Amino acid sequence: MKITDLAGSNFPELSAQLKGDAATIEIGGITADSRQVKPGDLFVAVAGSKADGAAYIADALSRGASAVVAGTGTPAEAGAPVFAISDPRRFLAKAASSFYGRQPETMVAVTGTAGKTSVASFTRQIWAHSGFSAAMIGTTGVVAPGRTEYGSLTTPDPVSLHKLLAELADEGVTHAAMEASSHGLDQRRLDGVELAAAAFTNLGRDHMDYHPTVEHYMASKMRLFGALLPKGSPAVIFADDQWSAEAIAAARKAGHDVRTVGRNGDFIALKRVEHFRHKQSAEVHVGDDIYEIHVPLAGDFQIANALVAAGLAMSTGITAKAAFSALERLQGASGRLELVGQTKDGALAYVDYAHKPDALANVLESVRPFTTGRVVVVFGCGGDRDKGKRPIMGEIASRLADVVIVTDDNPRSEVPEVIRAEIMAAAKGATEIGDRAEAIRAAVGMLKTGDTLIVAGKGHEEGQTVGSVTLPFSDHAEVRKALGGL
């Protein structure tokens, strides 16, 4: 493929530089990591939070890069094909899309602070129950027929993403649901994906170490509607969040077919919910039709996630009857209010990914209706991340749980004792146990009939990062081990 094919009509400032010999440059691959450059590759130099790709242009050229695309103002390399444009990140995404050239026919993306993984997972399951070969891409990795791969990023980099989409298409996958993180949207990682529909779940405090304000955080998420979703496409929005009105306004301004779901929804209207220990039932209205739905998962927020997923499925050709029928067979996403086991006395032990204030509040509130005893929570806060949320989460835990144990959760380069102290300052009556495994053992050991334990923060993760080293650690495994020792 020639570099002119990648520039196309989307990047006239690049096309204007591709004259003479430059127009004939052949591209054998694309990367934004100079260490991965192979002879004939195109190196796209993007500025990151820790390093600027422009500093590695010489390294990329020495490894055989056939050309370099970098940001405006990048110094020219003598005799080297270095082309400067205003938005190399967007070019990287579009170029990766053009280079790999294939994706599943029906793609949807979901953004929001919480619920992205569950919505993507549920949408995939609804499609699959309707007979389609379907995949999901997100925080827990990739799930598709014949493959389950753990991933570390909610939204992969553009090159990895489009390579994956091409592989899925070649494997016969026709439908795919993916998470769209604020980082991924802000960094243009999804700009080359062709979407059939998109969704918004909610907005709460998160990534304040990256976004200067919550308004910037919301604006990054709204790029999904304003820049990526084709005009006139369905935009499914959860209607009961404090930021729903802003999301609806953004989607309407972009010219989309807005479809709201929830208690205030007009596409899928939630009229009644009954909570049970391991399941929920609800009445929903779609137009003049009334449906009784059953979701085999605990937690009010899972009803919200299920409705958003049903909205996406219905917006991509699935009937309401088929979508709601599929909800009865849902399997929860790994580490999302996942029941790991119970004591001999029947106390339940869950693992949940809640690592931000709203998510912690949601999960603690969700288990209260079926908890006849005490709600016990074990949690911590990550190092080198938003420090402002630590006392907020401490207050939430002490207010909504009966027993709180504060422990470590990926302290990274920070001093664990300092992180715990910042949480404990607002966590009235909490117990501090730094060793996470010991904290889990202590929590399980105190459980009585009717109690519910939530081990929050890690969910599906299988490591504890201390300093620069990630040590093997699984909340699931530690909970099972503690239950087995009773």
From Swiss-Prot:
Q: Which residues form a coiled coil?
A: none
Cofactor names from the entry are: Mg(2+)
Binding of ATP, residues: G112, T113, A114, G115, K116, T117, S118
**EC number(s) per UniProt?**
6.3.2.13
Give residues where N6-carboxylysine occurs: K221
Q: Which reaction(s) does its UniProt entry say it catalyses? A: UDP-N-acetyl-alpha-D-muramoyl-L-alanyl-D-glutamate + meso-2,6-diaminopimelate + ATP = UDP-N-acetyl-alpha-D-muramoyl-L-alanyl-gamma-D-glutamyl-meso-2,6-diaminopimelate + ADP + phosphate + H(+)
- Per UniProt, meso-2,6-diaminopimelate binds at R385, D409, N410, P411, R412, G457, E461
Q: What's a single GO MF annotation on this record? A: ATP binding
CC annotations in GO? cytoplasm
Q: Where in the cell is it found?
A: Cytoplasm
Which superkingdom does the taxonomy of this entry point to?
Answer: Bacteria
Instruction: Return the similarity comment.
Output: Belongs to the MurCDEF family. MurE subfamily.
Q: What does this protein do?
A: Catalyzes the addition of meso-diaminopimelic acid to the nucleotide precursor UDP-N-acetylmuramoyl-L-alanyl-D-glutamate (UMAG) in the biosynthesis of bacterial cell-wall peptidoglycan.
Its name, as the record gives it, is: UDP-N-acetylmuramoyl-L-alanyl-D-glutamate--2,6-diaminopimelate ligase
